[in-house]
Amino acid sequence: MTDVQETQKGALKEIQAFIRSRTSYDVLPTSFRLIVFDVTLFVKTSLSLLTLNNIVSAPLWDSEANKFAGLLTMADFVNVIKYYYQSSSFPEAIAEIDKFRLLGLREVERKIGAIPPETIYVHPMHSLMDACLAMSKSRARRIPLIDVDGETGSEMIVSVLTQYRILKFISMNCKETAMLRVPLNQMTIGTWSNLATASMETKVYDVIKMLAEKNISAVPIVNSEGTLLNVYESVDVMHLIQDGDYSNLDLSVGEALLKRPANFDGVHTCRATDRLDGIFDAIKHSRVHRLFVVDENLKLEGILSLADILNYIIYDKTTTPGVPEQTDNFESAV
């Protein structure tokens, strides 16, 4: 093992200790807004509310059972579109979507053979490591924080924790991230083969099928030579159908990208020789959802997701969940 590798190994242990010593609640900003949807809400209405509030997910609440009922994400809309787009009568399918309620989402997943997401959550005052491990085990990109009233036993939705917020919290509070200097191509991290890609001419619906079948949140857009041009994300689908115009799904990716909002976070790239210290610095200063690994000619070589980074950080023999220490000397990830 080289000195750089030895240093990185020691840094990982320090970062893991930091994660175990903090709670999920510590990651939350001082003030924030939480939007919760009742499961009786129409899918069409929920889509409009997500767009209006510029959010991509929301906790679900079953008011009849008085308990947390899961998390609404872009994957749910992708599954609904795939299910109804396969209908023999497209006009009837569109009319049915308009009458569809959130409580029917699990039935849609069953019919298209999609794996239903686990209704997982963690207590906000438990170790942040518990949240990281739960997200990794379920392959979730975010996890709800649920408290329970000690007297009534009623569940209370506190917030939703995302991979990005956790990694930004680490980047802001762990100086050890500057010691992660092993190049990506010398680490077991990321996806480097069998990449799902599309071209500017690919129909949006074909990209939606990729998103649903591969359980991914984005598809890189490349040209005939494999050069990275753009990315089509599941959130782009939300903006495309927000007005109820499902005919937009027949557009090409190139046409659909012209309808993308101006606040798009951009396409983040890196090289195979880049290191996690620089990537954590990027996460600290920019809203990064994933990084596309490219060569000097921008030819796509691999994809590094936030899940890849978080899993690399937490998976070690020292990742046993611990009892958080009570410390206030850190910054929340706003």
Curated annotation (Swiss-Prot):
Write out the GO biological process terms: cellular response to glucose starvation; induction of conjugation with cellular fusion; positive regulation of gluconeogenesis; regulation of carbon utilization; regulation of glycolytic process; regulation of transcription by RNA polymerase II; signal transduction
User: Which keywords appear in this protein's UniProt record, sorted alphabetically?
Assistant: ATP-binding, Carbohydrate metabolism, CBS domain, Cytoplasm, Nucleotide-binding, Nucleus, Repeat, Transcription, Transcription regulation
Q: What is its main location?
A: nucleus
* Keyword Transcription among record annotations: yes
One Pfam family matching this protein: CBS
What the entry lists under SUPFAM superfamilies is as follows: CBS-domain pair
Q: Provide the Gene Ontology terms for cellular component.
A: cytoplasm; cytosol; nucleotide-activated protein kinase complex; nucleus
The UniProt record lists the keyword RNA-binding? no
Q: Where does ADP 2 bind?
A: R141, T191, A196, S217, A218, S305, L306, A307, D308
Coiled-coil residues: none
According to the record's subunit comment, the protein's assembly and interactions are: AMPK is a heterotrimer of an alpha catalytic subunit (ssp2), a beta (amk2) and a gamma non-catalytic subunits (cbs2). Forms a dimer of trimers.
Concerning its family, UniProt says: Belongs to the 5'-AMP-activated protein kinase gamma subunit family.
Q: What does this protein do?
A: Adenine nucleotides-binding subunit gamma of AMP-activated protein kinase (AMPK), an energy sensor protein kinase that plays a key role in regulating cellular energy metabolism. In response to reduction of intracellular ATP levels, AMPK activates energy-producing pathways and inhibits energy-consuming processes: inhibits protein, carbohydrate and lipid biosynthesis, as well as cell growth and proliferation. AMPK acts via direct phosphorylation of metabolic enzymes, and by longer-term effects via phosphorylation of transcription regulators.
Q: What is this protein called?
A: 5'-AMP-activated protein kinase subunit gamma
From which source organism is this entry? Schizosaccharomyces pombe (strain 972 / ATCC 24843) (Fission yeast)
Instruction: Read off the lineage from the record.
Output: Eukaryota, Fungi, Dikarya, Ascomycota, Taphrinomycotina
| Gene (UniProt) | cbs2
